[in-house]
Amino acid sequence: MSPRQPLVLALLVLGCCSAAPRRRQPTLVVFPGELRTRLTDRQLAEEYLFRYGYTRVASMHGDSQSLRLPLLLLQKHLSLPETGELDNATLEAMRAPRCGVPDVGKFQTFEGDLKWHHHNITYWIQNYSEDLPRDVIDDAFARAFALWSAVTPLTFTRVYSRDADIVIQFGVAEHGDGYPFDGKDGLLAHAFPPGPGIQGDAHFDDEELWSLGKGVVVPTYFGNADGAPCHFPFTFEGRSYTACTTDGRSDGMAWCSTTADYDTDRRFGFCPSERLYTQDGNADGKPCEFPFIFQGRTYSACTTDGRSDGHRWCATTASYDKDKLYGFCPTRADSTVVGGNSAGELCVFPFVFLGKEYSSCTSEGRRDGRLWCATTSNFDSDKKWGFCPDKGYSLFLVAAHEFGHALGLDHSSVPERLMYPMYRYLEGSPLHEDDVRGIQHLYGPNPNPQPPATTTPEPQPTAPPTACPTWPATVRPSEHPTTSPTGAPSAGPTGPPTASPSAAPTASLDPAEDVCNVNVFDAIAEIGNKLHVFKDGRYWRFSEGSGRRPQGPFLIADTWPALPAKLDSAFEEPLTKKLFFFSGRQVWVYTGASVLGPRRLDKLGLGPEVPHVTGALPRAGGKVLLFGAQRFWRFDVKTQTVDSRSGAPVDQMFPGVPLNTHDVFQYREKAYFCQDRFFWRVSTRNEVNLVDQVGYVSFDILHCPED
C-alpha cells in the first residue's frame, strides 16, 4: 500500500464528516381564520374568465383547448402575449388587484344610458372607511372628480342626500348590489354606468387598506409639525420605523416623525391615542382616565365590555359608575391589522410566537413572506393575529378609475391608461391622452380648460427644534368632536349600535319635539335592547329603567345617513346584529356603520302586491316574520329571501289582532301590532299566540303623562 494511501483515506473521511450543515427549514404554520385558496390554476382561470365577461359559463368542461379562445380574448384585452395558453404572465395578471367591472359586457342590474344627459353631476359620500381621516377621503374623491372636470364641461357638486347622481359607498362582501367583494386584494372596487337608481354609483371594498398609495395615513397631534401626518418609514437614532413608536420616551406615548429622517429634521407629532383624546361619547373629547371603574370592575385599557357593536371605549373619570362620562378610543391605521382573525384590532408588542418574543411585525411562520403580528401578547396561547398594514391602495387613483365608469367609460386595453382594469400606483396626473379622448367623445372638451388638481405637497421642515419629543404638559387636544354630548344610558355607554358610536340630540325640526305629542309613529323597533320610535326623519330611544322618559329626538340622517326620512318598519336580527330598515318598496341593511342598499323588495322575493313592509318579528335560527298587505312571510336573514310558500293571512297565526295594522314589532320578547294610537300585545303560551293586552303606545309603552 502506498504511504500516501492512508492520507487520502483520511482526507476523504474528513471531507465526508465536515460537509456543510443543512440549513434549518423555516417553521410554517397554518394561521387560524385565514382563507386559503384551493383553486387549481384552471379553476382560477375559469372563475376569472366568467367573472369578467370572457365566458358565459362558470365552469368549462374539457381539455385546455376549451379555454383557448377566451384566453386569447383576455390576453388581447389586457395587452398580454396572445398565446391562448394559461401561462405565467396570464396567471400573474389574473392574481393582480383590479377593478370589479367586467372587461366584456356590463353589470346587468338596470338598463342604463351610456352618458349623463346633464353636466352638473352630484355625488354623495354615503359612508366612510376607517383607514383614512374623513377630510382625506373627501379630498381624494374631490381630486378624482377634478381630473374629469378639467377635460370636460362636467362639474361635480357634493350633496348630502340619496338623490345624488353618484352615490359613493364603502362595503364588504355582499353589500346589496348582487356583485360581492372578495376580501382583501383581488377585486378593489366597482361602479355602474350612468342611469337612475344604483346606476352611476361607485362601491369600494372596505376590506382593503385604503391609503394614498404610499402606506397608512396617520395624523399627528401636538409635537412641532403642525399636525402633519406621519412619514413611514422614518429614521430615529439610525433605526428605521414603519409604525408609531414609544422608543426614546419614558412616558409610553407613541409618536412618529413627519419627515423621512427625524435625526436630521427633528419634526414629530404624537400618534392618535386615548391618552390624548376620545371621540364622540359625552365627555367633550377628554382623554381616557386609567384605571377606571365600570360595573364595579377596574379597567386599565379601553374595552368593548357593555357594548354590542364592538367599539372600544373608556371612562374619562376614575369611575364610570359614578360619573357616567365616557368617550370612544381612537384607532391607529399603522397598527390596526388587516384580515387574519382579528381584523380591526391593534398589534400588541411584544408578542410571543413559537416561544420567541417579537417587538415588531414579522414574516416568521409564513410561506408568502407577508408581515403579520399578534393582537394579544401571546399568539401561542390565544391564536389571535392579523396582517400588518402595507402600502395600501391609493383611494384617489381607484376612485378616479371608478368615476370614469360612472361617467360611461369602459375598460381600456392600454396598460398606461387610467381605465386599464389593473391597479398600479403612479405619481402625477394619471389621465392618459386616450382617457381624455374617450371622455371627450361622450361629453366634449372643457370650454374653459384648467389644469387638474394636484396633491398638496408635504410640508417641509423649518428650523429644527433642539429638543427631542416631549409631552405637552398643560395643553389639551385642540380638536375634539363637534357633536353635542349625549347622556350615556345607565347600563353603560351603548348609544345607537350602528352608526358612528354615538348620536347627539339634535335641534328640534318642529315645535312637536316631545315624543308624547306624536299620535302615530312611522315605525317602531327594538334596537340594542332599547325601543326606537321613528317619526318624520327623527327618532327617540326608550328603555325601561332609564328614568322612564325617552331620549331624543335624534336625526335619522345623523345615525343612519343612507335612510330616508319616512320609514315603514325596522328590526334588528339578534344573531348578527344587522339592522333592516324598510321604506316603500326598498330595504337597507346596516352592519355597524356599513350599509347595503337600497335594494328593491323584489330582491327579497316580495312582489308588487306588497306595497311596503309594515313590520317584522325576529324568530330563532336567523328567521324573521315579515308583514305586509295583511299577510306575513318567513324571511331567511342569511339568504335575504322570503319563502314564497310561506305567505299566509296574519290572523291565521295571530288571531285577535287587527288586520290593517301599520306597524308590527317585537319588544321584550312579545309581539306588538299597532293600529292608529293603539297596540295589541301578543304572548305565546303552549305554542298558541294570544292577545294579552290592548293599550296606548304613548301611555302604556312610553309612559307619557295622561293629561
Curated annotation (Swiss-Prot):
Composition-biased stretches, type Low complexity, lie in: 481-493
Q: Where is the Fibronectin type-II domain?
A: 225-273, 283-331, 342-390
Q: In which tissues is it expressed?
A: Osteoclasts.
GO CC: one term?
extracellular matrix
The entry's protein name is Matrix metalloproteinase-9
Where is there biased composition of kind Pro residues? 446-467
Q: Name one GO molecular function term.
A: peptidase activity
Which residues make up the binding site for Ca(2+) 2? D165, G197, Q199, D201
- Known EC number(s)? 3.4.24.35
Where is Zn(2+) 1 annotated to bind? H175, D177, H190, H203
Q: Does the keyword Nucleotide-binding apply?
A: no
Where Ca(2+) 3 binds, per the record, is at: D182, G183, D185, L187, D205, E208
| Function of the protein | Matrix metalloproteinase that plays an essential role in local proteolysis of the extracellular matrix and in leukocyte migration. Could play a role in bone osteoclastic resorption. Cleaves KiSS1 at a Gly-|-Leu bond. Cleaves NINJ1 to generate the Secreted ninjurin-1 form. Cleaves type IV and type V collagen into large C-terminal three quarter fragments and shorter N-terminal one quarter fragments. Degrades fibronectin but not laminin or Pz-peptide.
Q: Where is this motif: Cysteine switch?
A: 97-104
Q: Disulfide connectivity?
A: C230-C256, C244-C271, C288-C314, C302-C329, C347-C373, C361-C388, C516-C704
User: Which residues have a glycan attached per UniProt?
Assistant: N88, N120, N127
Start and end residues of each stretch annotated as Disordered: 437-508
Per the entry, the cofactor note is: Binds 2 Zn(2+) ions per subunit.
